[in-house]
Amino acid sequence: MPTVKQLIRNARQPIRNARKSAALKGCPQRRGTCARVYTINPKKPNSALRKVARVRLTSGFEITAYIPGIGHNLQEHSVVLVRGGRVKDLPGVRYRIIRGTLDAVAVKNRQQGRSKYGAKKPKK
């Protein structure tokens, strides 16, 4: 327990909340370059091969980002736009790649939830 004199000399520091997406540096999205594109297995009750990419951001961070949707065209040196948003069954994956921008093409034949995958409205 500090004395009153110690508290006058050095006030208590407020506890700061940690940012959930520190690599974005307060921006809504960041551009980055894929360093590696690979698959990983999800946590226990789930089973799949989830597509992820190791991305070097313009903020200087290297992060693991999830590639949403069915099928993708990403490879090493692809330029992508990254947003925050974790994937619950992939530990350490706290970012997602935005489909339909830069080098990440939109998901084909997507009818519902198109805005999340960069898909255009289908012609009638």
Swiss-Prot record:
GO biological process: translation
InterPro entries recorded: NA-bd_OB-fold, Ribosomal_uS12, Ribosomal_uS12_bac
Primary site of residence: plastid
Localization per Swiss-Prot or TrEMBL: Plastid, Chloroplast
Cellular component annotations (GO), alphabetically ordered: chloroplast; ribosome; small ribosomal subunit
Top-level taxon: Eukaryota
Entry keyword set: Chloroplast, Plastid, Ribonucleoprotein, Ribosomal protein, RNA-binding, rRNA-binding
Keyword Transmembrane applies: no
Pfam families recorded: Ribosom_S12_S23 (PF00164)
Single GO MF annotation: rRNA binding
Assembly with partners or alone: Part of the 30S ribosomal subunit.
Main function: With S4 and S5 plays an important role in translational accuracy. Located at the interface of the 30S and 50S subunits.
Family statement: Belongs to the universal ribosomal protein uS12 family.
Protein's name according to its UniProt entry: Small ribosomal subunit protein uS12cz/uS12cy
